[in-house]
Amino acid sequence: MKNLTRRFLQAAMFGCCFLTSLFGAEEKKIVCFGDSLTSCGGKDGRYSDMLQRSLPGYRIINSGKGGDTLGGGLARLDQAVLQHHAQYLVIGLGANDYWRRKRTLNELKKDYEEILSRCTAAGMKIVVISCFGNEKLPPGATLDFDRAGLPLEHYAAGIALIERELVKKYHAGYVPDMQCGITPKGRRDLWSDSNHPNAAGNRIVADTILPELRTILK
């Protein structure tokens, strides 16, 4: 009986190895999750499309949605990210919260942390991409994390502080300024409008993201 059991287990292990070699290992997936800066660029012109060309061994899923905010991203997290069972996440949210200035920095931090916490709990490795990471408060200014309607430069500096704190806490990669290669915006050939890169601009954005992304793919 013991011999039969041993042979059965050996056969089962052989079968698993055979199926793995036949169908390949688990598919490696990266979700790019964000607002219009993730969805812009047109057909084959999004930064995620450029990343796909540089990383042919991965399937890259674009979950960008124009106008999205941190609260909106949290609300659609299951459908846009977690249902894909991806191993990696590139997340860029906060630009529309910055423009609207309707919520406090503490509210934004709470939503961002819940997103990162849930994705980390799902086993995902994360890169946070930003437009604000190099922003600083004006000299002599202080941040009020409990008041909405702050000046734009205060929001930018506050979001940068939130990002730096959370990437450290969740051991995430960080791209402080995803658009550093296409600003100042005098390069009109890289922009489809005043806020959104075109395909040529997104090629540079992808090249800016790629080195940090590779660090979590190792």
Where are these regions (language model features)?
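Serine-esterase "nucleophile elbow" of acetyl-processing enzymes
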Residues: 23-88
